[in-house]
A protein has these predicted regions:
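Intrinsic disorder/low-complexity detector
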Residues: 1-114, 127, 137, 145, ...
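Short amphipathic alpha-helical interaction segments
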Residues: 112-127, 283-297
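A short, conserved structural fragment
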Residues: 126-136, 297-307
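Residue-level "edge-of-site" marker
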Residues: 138, 292, 309
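Conserved catalytic core of two-component sensor histidine kinases, primarily the HATPase_c ATP-binding
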Residues: 142
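Active-site/pore-lining binding-face segments in mid-to-C-terminal subdomains
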Residues: 276-283, 293-294, 300-304
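Long, charge-rich, low-complexity alpha-helical segments
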Residues: 312-313
């Protein structure tokens, strides 16, 4: 519904001041990242964007647990930090061990979330089998947070839902090759050929038994190399306020995805999506759905022409915001490939 969006990235160094220091002693922006982020040649086309939106809607719609754990921005940040900090651990360096205290120190110092919320989220991840605590063999007094196969599988599937459409993109050979290479590193069967992975069954949640597999060495290596970029990655997402503001609330990002998906499917900017339908698919109350739509209107993403979601206009700014958001996310995901 709109032209391809150019890659956007803030001036190097500006995010560190805004987001705080997560990775002490590390320069998060390496040469490879700068080349990709500042080349200004990467674009996201409407077909790629629509395919990503469809993938995410198929994956998360109706899957209340996974949507809450991975789409709400604060939980997403903790999820990502756990994976990267775990992959970057050095058994010989106790300061690198992923303990609850270290996770709290890294994230709470940035101002992105509080220590109490981090502890609560860790308990939730543990309750649903995404992480477990193990005593360090070198010091039984210390408990290490360990991402389980369930968490690694959810991360691999989430990444695949974003990147698989890029593998089929014509005229973007370098980007397509990078996406295919990364998916191959995450895949156990090496089937990253741009087609849907066998685990990407929308009827099987990412945390179900069908999709659980231990992380590949390539997956861990990618997360390890991504760790120095994580601070700026979070900062980039914070700069996209029209989307991140919705993503900070339960069901907000999924609601936006469903609106864009419906508009793309119908080929019209004027759609109907009742608050009861949003409530059912996103696992939120109808009152919360109404408040999300009112917030989306305040942010300039939609215009409400009738009550109850009977006439919603998806504005061009919503497509532009999603294009810019996905472009920035793609740049970071591929920065270390």
């Amino acid at each position: 519904m709109n032209a391809a969006a150019p890659l956007k990235h803030p001036v190097p160094g500006t995010l560190r001041a805004a987001a705080g220091c997560l990775w002490e002693g590390t320069e998060p922006q390496n040469a490879a990242a700068l080349e990709i982020l500042n080349a200004g040649q990467q674009v996201i086309t409407p077909p790629v964007r629509d395919a990503v939106v469809q993938n995410l809607v198929s994956l998360f719609r109706g899957d209340y647990l996974l949507a809450r754990l991975m789409l709400e921005e604060g939980r997403f940040m903790v999820f990502q930090a756990i994976l990267c900090l775990s992959a970057a651990q050095n058994p010989e360096d106790r300061d690198s061990w992923l303990t609850l205290g270290r996770l709290q120190a890294r994230l709470s110092s940035s101002g992105l979330t509080s220590r109490n919320r981090i502890e609560a989220l860790v308990a939730i991840f543990e309750r649903y089998g995404f992480i477990e605590r193990r005593k360090a063999e070198e010091d039984l007094r210390i408990s290490i947070l360990m991402p389980t196969a369930r968490m690694w599988s959810a991360d691999a599937l989430f990444t695949e839902m974003h990147l698989s459409p890029l593998c089929r993109e014509q005229g973007q050979e370098e980007t397509s090759a990078g996406a295919s290479q990364l998916l191959a590193r995450l895949s156990h069967g090496g089937e990253a050929n741009g087609s849907s992975h066998q685990h990407a069954d929308p009827m099987a949640p990412a945390w179900s038994e069908r999709s659980i597999a231990p992380a590949t060495a390539g997956h861990r290596n990618w997360r390890r190399s991504f760790a120095p970029l994580l601070q700026d990655y979070f900062g980039m997402r914070m700069q996209h306020r029209s989307i991140s503001a919705l993503a900070e609330r339960d069901g907000g990002y999924l609601t936006l995805l469903m609106l864009l998906h419906e508009a793309a499917q119908t080929g019209s900017s004027r759609i109907q999506m009742g608050y009861e339908s949003i409530s059912e698919h996103a696992g939120i109350s109808r009152t919360h759905a109404r408040l999300l739509m009112e917030q989306a209107e305040t942010l300039g993403l939609v215009q409400l022409h009738a009550r109850g979601g009977r006439d919603i206009e998806v504005r061009q700014s919503a497509w532009d915001a999603m294009d810019s958001w996905l472009t920035g996310n793609f740049a970071y995901l591929l920065a270390t490939v």
